[in-house]
Swiss-Prot record:
The name this protein goes by in its record: Nuclear distribution protein nudF-1
Subunit (UniProt): Self-associates. Interacts with ro-11/nde1 and dynein.
Biological process annotations from GO: cell division; establishment of mitotic spindle orientation; microtubule organizing center organization; microtubule sliding; nuclear migration; vesicle transport along microtubule
Pfam families in UniProt: LisH_PAC1, WD40
UniProt similarity note: Belongs to the WD repeat LIS1/nudF family.
Residue ranges of coiled coil: none
SUPFAM superfamilies linked: Lissencephaly-1 protein (Lis-1, PAF-AH alpha) N-terminal domain, WD40 repeat-like
Record localization: Cytoplasm, Cytoskeleton; Cytoplasm, Cytoskeleton, Spindle pole
UniProt xrefs under PANTHER family: WD REPEAT-CONTAINING PROTEIN POP1
WD repeats: 122-163, 165-205, 209-256, 259-298, 321-364, 366-405, 448-486
Domain notes for this protein: Dimerization mediated by the LisH domain may be required to activate dynein.
Role summary: Positively regulates the activity of the minus-end directed microtubule motor protein dynein. May enhance dynein-mediated microtubule sliding by targeting dynein to the microtubule plus end. Required for nuclear migration during vegetative growth as well as development. Required for retrograde early endosome (EE) transport from the hyphal tip. Required for localization of dynein to the mitotic spindle poles. Recruits additional proteins to the dynein complex at SPBs.
Length: 486
């Protein structure tokens, strides 16, 4: 039989991609018992049977169908986005001056309003945590139902469900080294898992090492003095009373931080990655300096809460002018500094604001139950909190921390977590979040961290606040995610 002169494959594919496609087709044909067709294709490709036997073919079974359905989902998303774009364009064309002014509201003063844009339902048990992708419109949520779900917050659609943990998922966070964003999760099953968003959220690594529940996990930003340069570090907090720092490229624990005498329930890094803030069941708030090399130095230990502490957050430099006034300072700290002000929430129903010397500068009272989550407004003027009293409260730091808004009637149960979408950063080094330059205006997460470390004194023209907030809650026996957006 004469050999065909037409090259199989497409010049749009690399050699490796073409090989993977050929193997997927062969595996598909084998699964359908089309042995003759498979043999003909194998002969055309000059692929020896021993180099791609039945055992190796099993790895590729279902891959072709999965890629096909992924294309269908993407086509649907494109159609939905085109439809939404058309509607938004119609709104702009028909906008009155008053409606247009509402749409162009100053983002530094925007606050979440009821009703939420979307109420996302799929989790069978309470939602414990949420996290935004730094580039795309993806949101991850973790739940006591052992799963992580990935949503498109712009469309309000469930994209996929990730399974792997064997107990409740307690925290999630996006971040990682330059050239590729990762998703980290931690669980009551004592493990931390890393997932690759660019490869259908494949579990690429599991980090064992903690001896008890792992309740908090955060990527450590890079690019500032004293911080790791590669952005490949992750910090975790556990009921074994320790904090651990991990290298996500190797999976090794590079540092164990001891000091808490009871469960440190929450940990967060400063915007430049130099400091860590931790708090928990020993009622203490601890500030750690990572600039000393192998050992983390405990710079401050703060007490004041009367019950277990559940959450903590560093204030962004945009909040320094307001918090400096609360602290009685004549001049705000320079924007280039970090760990100047902090906030903590507790089961004592209070929120405490602290300065960098360890002084409590303000106690915010208003919640009627445990305070579960805190987030500072990127513009620096507000602090948002959620609690078991089924409310979200907004505190105006320019008015001595007065509560200026309470969202009630939105939640059916306890509100467990809150996150603000990271800013859109315009940068020449932008990538699509998977290591390939796409000329996008959305920056690599590490580039974004470096840009924030350099320009965080004000809301720079290169940094655009995204007016999007996500919360997780307990609604009856199930969990729900709510999206508030401008």
């Amino acid at each position: 039989m004469a050999q065909a002169s037409v090259q199989i494959g497409t010049p749009l594919l690399t050699t490796r991609q073409a090989e993977e496609l050929h193997k997927s087709i062969l595996a598909y044909l084998a699964s359908k018992n089309l042995a003759t067709t498979a043999a003909t294709l194998r002969d055309e490709l000059d692929l020896a049977e021993e180099s791609f036997d039945a055992e190796k073919a099993k790895k590729y079974e279902g891959l072709l169908e999965k890629k096909w359905t992924s294309v269908v989902r993407l086509q649907k998303k494109i159609l939905d986005l085109e439809s939404r774009n058309h509607l938004l364009q119609s709104e702009i064309d028909n906008a009155t001056p008053s409606s247009l002014s509402r749409r162009t509201q100053d983002p530094t003063n925007w606050l979440p309003k009821a009703p939420p844009r979307y109420v996302l339902e799929s989790h069978r048990l309470p939602v414990t945590c949420v996290a935004f992708h730094p580039v795309f419109t993806s949101l991850a949520s973790g739940s006591e139902d052992y799963t992580i779900k990935i949503w498109d917050w712009e469309l309000g659609e469930l994209e996929r469900t990730i399974k792997g943990h064997t107990k409740a998922v307690l925290d999630v966070d996006f971040g990682g080294p330059r050239g590729g964003t990762l998703l980290a999760s931690c669980s009551s099953d004592l493990t931390i898992k890393l997932w690759d968003p660019s490869d259908e959220y494949k579990n690429i690594r599991t980090l064992p090492g903690h001896d008890h529940i792992v309740s908090s996990v955060r990527f450590i930003p890079s690019g500032a003095a004293g911080a790791p340069a590669s952005g490949n570090l992750l910090v975790s907090a556990s009921k074994d009373n320790s904090l651990k720092i991990w290298d996500v490229t190797t999976g090794y624990c590079v540092k164990t931080i001891l000091g808490h005498v009871d469960w440190p329930r929450a940990v967060c890094p400063s915007h430049d990655g130099r400091y860590l803030l931790s708090t928990g069941s020993d009622k203490s708030v601890r500030l750690w300096d990572l600039a000393g090399g192998r050992d983390a130095e405990c710079r401050l230990v703060m007490f004041g809460h009367e019950n277990y502490n559940l959450c903590c957050a560093f204030a962004p430099p945009t909040a320094y002018p307001h918090l400096a006034k609360l602290a009685g300072l004549e001049r705000a700290p320079p924007p280039s500094s970090s760990a100047e002000f902090m906030a903590t929430g507790s089961r004592d129903k209070q929120i405490r604001l602290w300065d960098g010397r360890g002084n409590c500068i303000k106690v915010l009272v208003g919640h009627d139950n445990w305070v579960r989550g805190l987030v500072f407004h990127p513009g620096g003027k507000y602090l948002l909190s959620v609690a078991d009293d089924r409310t979200m409260r907004c505190w105006d730091l320019s008015q001595e921390g007065r509560c200026v808004q309470t969202l009630t009637g939105v939640y059916e149960g306890f509100v467990s977590c809150i996150r603000w979408a990271p800013p859109v950063v315009k940068d020449a080094d932008a990538t699509a979040g998977n290591g390939r330059s796409e000329g996008s205006s959305l920056a690599d997460p590490v580039v974004a961290a470096r840009r924030r470390a350099a320009t965080v004194g004000s809301v720079s023209a290169s940094v655009q606040i995204r007016c999007v907030v996500a919360t997780g809650s307990v609604d009856g026996a199930e969990g729900k995610v709510r999206i508030f957006a401008n």
